[in-house]
A protein has these predicted regions:
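Flexible, surface-exposed loop regions and adjacent strand-edge segments
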Residues: 44-46
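Charge-rich, low-complexity N-terminal segments
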Residues: 1-24, 31-37, 48-130
Length: 130
């Protein structure tokens, strides 16, 4: 397998998911400097009404976000990546495969929405979610 560095291409941007029971966030870092170039999260103003409704519901749910919210966060990230000219990102495959099963489905939804929006997600095709 030929690496991008040997071909003279710059290393790809790294997409990282930050997942908890309260929120899901995704950030894209620059390859050499590790600075964040784009970010989206489920606690942005667009999701406040949904979060409030979910938190005041009885019985309470354990997660404050689901696959639908994760997909919308992915769409927002893809729009921001298009705005700055990033067309390809890479995920840490080992980290994604080590996630608990109940976080994998929404993570797959988020990564799939980024890919459907036109940003190539390297490594997404190797993930197998339940």
């Amino acid at each position: 397998m030929i690496s991008q560095v040997s071909m003279g291409l710059p290393p790809p941007h790294l997409l990282r998911l930050i997942v908890s029971c309260r929120k899901i966030a995704v950030e894209v870092t620059a390859p050499r400097t590790s600075t964040i170039v784009a970010m989206a999260a489920s606690d942005e103003p667009e999701f406040l009404v949904q979060n409030h409704a979910r938190n005041t519901r009885f019985p309470r749910t354990r997660l404050c976000w689901d696959a639908r919210v994760a997909a919308r966060v992915g769409e927002k990230l893809a729009i921001r990546l298009h705005d700055i000219g990033v067309s390809s990102v890479e995920i840490d495959l080992d980290e994604e495969l080590s996630r608990p099963a109940h976080f994998r489905r929404p993570a797959a939804s988020l990564l799939g929405s980024v890919a459907r929006a036109g940003v190539h997600v390297a490594g997404f095709d190797k993930l197998q979610y339940p």
